């Protein structure tokens, strides 16, 4: 039985029902349907905190999915898992790969900025202000890109940019 059929989460069940209806209505190849099934099961596992299972599903979805736009969301979700696991270098790599395929993912820019800001704070704690400033500058660039894509979102980032005089 597919993982998504056993999930007790109402939102996931609703998403699965709608997704299954769309897969029946919209003309898609069997490979596209299979890729989406793996993606959907990956999201279900990820929402339950089963990251290893989610990654397996996402990697299988990546093997089958050919559309760059759809691949960008798979890569983004893989980045989220690496972020949650504290694997920031890997997370940045996957966010970057997602943005190569879809440059209109403000959430990827935001997550990259958060990681850079975190690394900047680590450098401050270690007494390396030069490295900290470089990380903060990089965070600022990513937040500017996220804000440019979705004006009105990322209010805290916008305020940080103003306070630190990094907003142009």
UniProtKB/Swiss-Prot annotation:
Q: Where are the transmembrane segments?
A: none
Q: Name one GO biological process term.
A: photosynthesis
Q: What is this protein called?
A: Photosystem I assembly protein Ycf3
Q: Which HAMAP family match?
A: Ycf3 (MF_00439)
SUPFAM superfamilies hit by this protein: TPR-like
Name the keywords, alphabetized. Answer: Chloroplast, Membrane, Photosynthesis, Plastid, Repeat, Thylakoid, TPR repeat
> Where in the sequence is the signal peptide annotated?
none
- Output the Gene Ontology cellular-component terms: chloroplast thylakoid membrane
Sorted alphabetically, which Pfam families does this protein's record hold?
TPR_1 (PF00515)
Q: Which InterPro entries match?
A: PSI_Ycf3_assembly, TPR-like_helical_dom_sf, TPR_rpt, Ycf3/AcsC/BcsC/TPR_MFPF
Q: Where in the cell is it found?
A: Plastid, Chloroplast thylakoid membrane
Membrane topology, as annotated: Peripheral membrane protein
Q: Where does it mainly reside?
A: plastid
Query: What domain of life?
Result: Eukaryota
> Any idea what job this protein has?
Essential for the assembly of the photosystem I (PSI) complex. May act as a chaperone-like factor to guide the assembly of the PSI subunits.
Give start and end residues of every TPR repeat.
Answer: 35-68, 72-105, 120-153
Which gene does this sequence derive from? ycf3
Q: Which family does it belong to?
A: Belongs to the Ycf3 family.
